Amino acid sequence: MTRTNLDFLTETDPAIAGLLQQELQRQQDHLELIASENFTSAAVLAAQGSVLTNKYAEGLPGKRYYGGCEYIDKVEQLAIDRAKDLFQAAHANVQPHSGAQANFAVFLALLQPGDTIMGMDLSHGGHLTHGSPVNVSGKWFRVVHYGVDPVTEQLDYEKIRQLAHQHRPKLIICGYSAYPRIIQFDQFRAIADEVGAYLLADMAHIAGLVATGHHPSPIPVCDVVTTTTHKTLRGPRGGLILTRDPELGKKLDKAVFPGNQGGPLEHVIAAKAVAFGEALRPEFKTYSAQVIKNAQALSQQLQQRGFKIVSNGTDNHLLLVDLRSIGMTGKLADQLVSEVNITANKNTVPFDPESPFVTSGLRLGSAAMTTRGMGTPEFIEIANIIADRLLNPEDLAIVQECRQRVAQLCDRFPLYPHLSRVPVLS
């Protein structure tokens, strides 16, 4: 019988092995609706848990500061080539440890402290690294935030243009953590050109949709594109920088190393290469299309049950439920769905009167459960489970019924069954 990494871990450190097994069971037994999460393939898990974790490899393929990198170079070059092929980019750096590290490398390459940047307000769907005052991006740079239209709850490109002309930013950031609609990257390009700004697209949430043509690509029009490699791309947790400009790519490489990182995580880079290879296959395009269909089914059914959806729907993998329509906070809704084994997250909605610790919204995503094989009928049922729970917060019978319905869905669409034979350790 082939032994797994978990077998070895069980012998050496049963405490950690037991916790890993409990986390595995949590993932198997819950409906994962956090929009930024997904499930990697077993092949990605295998690459990340490989002997490549033993090797230091500062530098780039063919230009290392350590010996013994002949195979590491081939692994990283494969990741680079596959990323370029997947996104039709002229240059790729696969070394950023995260999306935040990728963004910071771009700032280091293009900006000086005190420069002006423009990004979406966090409460409207932006990200911490786009100028939030609690992040280094908000401390080192002068930040101008834009938001969505109060009526449509979608980007107001004319208002963004006016802000850009008023403040003349050095860098404009587009791409978000909680925006459910198509981003018109060409309109951002026109605005950036009018004011002489660099244009950065952070496509962390939609990278898998971009790769398969289900969302317009920022590569042809943006100066730099960053992304995480998990979320809709379904790879390991990590970052990636892409550009259509090879000369700018050299500058970005230096901003990653030695600019803000040391040794790259080559075991993670190998896992990225595997994920990029998977994303190049026809079945991944089918998967991405289903991700959108499932999110739209979830959104439409929740609307049928009386919930308000921010921007009245979704074009991608995520949706925001505005809980003010039922007089509930995001914090409470998060707690209520958690009690029936549904994992989601409270989230601010545009013009939210509540604090970020309470919020008026619930963010939901379809990527992870689509990976498990669920389709639109299952997502309609998920919407009904959520609605039944939130509309009956005090009904204990509903709690038990919803848990059973969640369990039935999870049993029909198993996750990592090959890992399930290891017993839970006390």
Swiss-Prot record:
Location of the protein in the cell: Cytoplasm
Catalytic reaction equation(s): (6R)-5,10-methylene-5,6,7,8-tetrahydrofolate + glycine + H2O = (6S)-5,6,7,8-tetrahydrofolate + L-serine
Gene3D superfamilies: Aspartate Aminotransferase, domain 1, Type I PLP-dependent aspartate aminotransferase-like (Major domain)
Site (Plays an important role in substrate specificity): 230
Alphabetical list of PROSITE patterns matching this protein: SHMT
GO CC terms in record: cytosol
Record-listed E.C. numbers: 2.1.2.1
Domain of life: Bacteria
GO molecular function: glycine hydroxymethyltransferase activity; pyridoxal phosphate binding
Keyword Lyase appears in the UniProt entry: no
GO biological process terms, semicolon-separated: glycine biosynthetic process from serine; tetrahydrofolate interconversion
Pathway membership: One-carbon metabolism; tetrahydrofolate interconversion; Amino-acid biosynthesis; glycine biosynthesis; glycine from L-serine: step 1/1
Modified residues (N6-(pyridoxal phosphate)lysine): 231
Keywords: Amino-acid biosynthesis, Cytoplasm, One-carbon metabolism, Pyridoxal phosphate, Transferase
Residues annotated to bind (6S)-5,6,7,8-tetrahydrofolate: 122, 126-128, 247, 355-357
Biological role stated in the UniProt entry: Catalyzes the reversible interconversion of serine and glycine with tetrahydrofolate (THF) serving as the one-carbon carrier. This reaction serves as the major source of one-carbon groups required for the biosynthesis of purines, thymidylate, methionine, and other important biomolecules. Also exhibits THF-independent aldolase activity toward beta-hydroxyamino acids, producing glycine and aldehydes, via a retro-aldol mechanism.
Subunit structure: Homodimer.
Protein name per its UniProtKB record: Serine hydroxymethyltransferase
Gene: glyA
